[in-house]
C-alpha cells in the first residue's frame, strides 16, 4: 500500500515475512495547502507563541521559570510513555537517594534537554546532535542494552506488552530504510523550506516518530526535537513551551493521528492537531507565568518589614526557591554559600510568612516546600 506519506514494504519471506513502513521524504508531495481552518490555527498558534516570547523578554527572572519549565516538560513527556513519577519526586533535594527507576529516567531527560540546548550553540540540529542527546537520555544501567547514542541495527515494532512482529500495531522502517529516512530528515531540518516553522516542526516530529531510529527513547527525543527546532529557527528564545502538556492530555488522539498519516497520507489533519497543541501549550505557559509572577510579587512585599541584613539573606533564599521549590537547609546553604544558621533563620521567617511549609518530618533532613508555587506548576502533571 502506497500513499503520499510513504509505502509499506515486504521484508523476509515465509513465516518470517512482515511489512515495514518506508516514509516518503519531506516536504510532502503534493505540497501542504495552508488555507481555511489550517491557516486560522496557524495564525492563532503564532500569535500565542509571540505573546509567550514577549513575556520571556520582559521578565527579569525568566531563567528561573525556564529551569522549572524544562523539568515540567521532561516529566510530562516521560508520563506520555507511562512513567510513574511526580513533580515532587524530581524536585526533592535528596533525589540522589531515590532508587526509583522512573525518577532516574526523568532526571536523565532533564540532563539530555540541558545537554542538547548547550550543544545547539555549537552544532546545527543534525543526526550527530540527536545521537549525542540520546546517549545522555539513556545514561543509566537499564539503558545500556538499548544502544545509547546509536541508531538501531535491528527491526523494532510498536505494540502492547508481549507483542511481536506478527501482531504489532506499527512496524517502523527496516534498518536500511531507517538510515535513508534519517539522512533525508536531517537534510529537511536544515533546508530552506518555505513552510511556516510551526508546520515544519509538526512534520519533523511526525517523521522522526514514524522512523523510530532508536531501540528506546524515540518519543522523548522526538518531542525534544520540537523545542530544539523552534529555537534554532528563532521562534523560541528559551524552552518555555512545554508541548507535552497538550500531547499528554490528548495521548490517544496524538498516536491516532500519526497512524492516520501513515495509512492515508493526510498530513493536514496531523498539522491541524499540532497547531492546536502549540496554541494551547503556549496559552498554558503564559497563564503559568502570569500566576507565578503574581505570586512572586505578592511574596516579595512580605520582605519589606525585615531588616536590611535579613532582607538580603531572604532574597537570596527566595530566588533559590523559585528554581528549587523543595529544599533542605544544608543543601541550600551549600548552594548559596551561606551559613547553615543564616539559612535556617530565613526558613523560619518564610514559614512564619506562610511561604514555606515543612512537608517531610520523617527523615533526618527536614524538607520544606514552597506549596503555592508547586500548586501552580503541578497542573496536569
Mark where each language-model region is.
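FIC/Doc superfamily catalytic core
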Residues: 1-381
Amino acid at each position: 500500500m502506497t500513499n503520499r506519506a510513504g509505502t509499506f514494504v515486504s521484508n523476509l519471506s515465509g513465516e518470517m515475512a512482515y511489512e515495514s513502513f518506508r516514509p516518503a521524504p519531506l516536504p510532502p508531495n503534493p505540497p501542504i495547502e495552508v488555507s481555511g481552518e489550517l491557516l486560522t490555527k496557524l495564525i492563532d498558534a503564532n500569535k500565542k507563541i509571540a505573546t509567550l516570547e514577549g513575556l520571556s523578554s520582559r521578565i527579569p527572572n525568566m531563567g528561573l521559570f525556564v529551569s522549572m519549565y524544562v523539568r515540567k516538560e521532561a516529566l510530562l513527556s516521560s508520563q506520555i510513555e507511562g512513567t510513574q513519577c511526580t513533580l515532587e519526586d524530581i524536585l526533592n533535594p535528596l533525589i540522589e537517594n531515590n532508587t526509583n527507576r522512573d525518577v532516574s529516567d526523568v532526571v536523565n531527560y532533564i540532563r539530555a534537554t540541558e545537554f542538547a540546548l548547550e550543544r545547539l550553540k555549537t552544532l546545527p540540529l543534525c543526526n550527530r546532535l540527536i545521537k549525542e542527546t540520546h546517549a545522555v537520555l539513556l545514561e543509566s544501567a537499564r539503558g545500556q542494552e538499548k544502544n545509547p547514542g546509536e541508531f538501531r541495527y535491528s527491526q523494532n515494532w510498536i505494540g502492547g506488552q508481549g507483542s511481536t512482529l506478527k501482531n504489532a500495531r506499527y512496524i517502523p522502517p527496516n534498518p536500511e530504510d531507517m538510515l535513508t529516512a534519517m539522512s533525508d530528515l536531517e537534510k529537511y531540518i536544515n533546508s530552506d523550506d518555505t513552510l511556516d516553522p510551526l508546520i515544519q516542526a509538526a512534520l519533523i516530529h511526525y517523521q522522526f516518530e514514524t522512523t523510530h531510529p532508536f531501540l528506546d527513547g524515540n518519543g522523548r527525543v522526538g518531542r525534544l526535537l520540537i523545542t530544539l527546532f523552534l529555537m534554532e529557527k528563532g521562534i523560541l528564545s528559551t524552552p518555555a513551551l512545554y508541548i507535552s502538556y497538550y500531547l499528554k492530555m490528548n495521548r490517544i488522539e496524538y498516536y491516532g493521528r500519526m497512524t492516520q498519516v501513515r495509512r492515508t497520507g493526510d498530513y493536514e489533519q496531523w498539522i491541524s492537531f499540532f497547531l492546536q497543541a502549540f496554541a494551547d501549550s503556549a496559552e498554558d505557559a503564559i497563564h503559568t507565568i502570569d500566576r507565578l509572577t503574581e505570586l512572586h510579587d505578592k511574596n516579595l512585599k512580605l520582605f519589606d518589614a525585615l531588616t536590611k541584613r535579613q532582607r538580603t539573606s531572604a532574597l537570596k533564599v527566595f530566588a533559590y526557591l523559585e528554581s528549587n521549590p523543595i529544599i533542605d537547609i544544608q543543601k541550600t546553604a551549600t548552594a548559596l554559600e551561606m551559613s547553615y544558621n543564616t539559612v535556617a533563620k530565613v526558613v523560619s521567617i518564610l514559614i512564619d510568612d506562610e511561604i514555606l511549609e515543612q512537608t517531610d518530618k520523617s527523615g533526618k533532613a527536614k524538607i520544606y516546600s514552597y506549596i503555592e508555587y508547586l500548586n501552580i506548576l503541578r497542573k496536569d502533571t
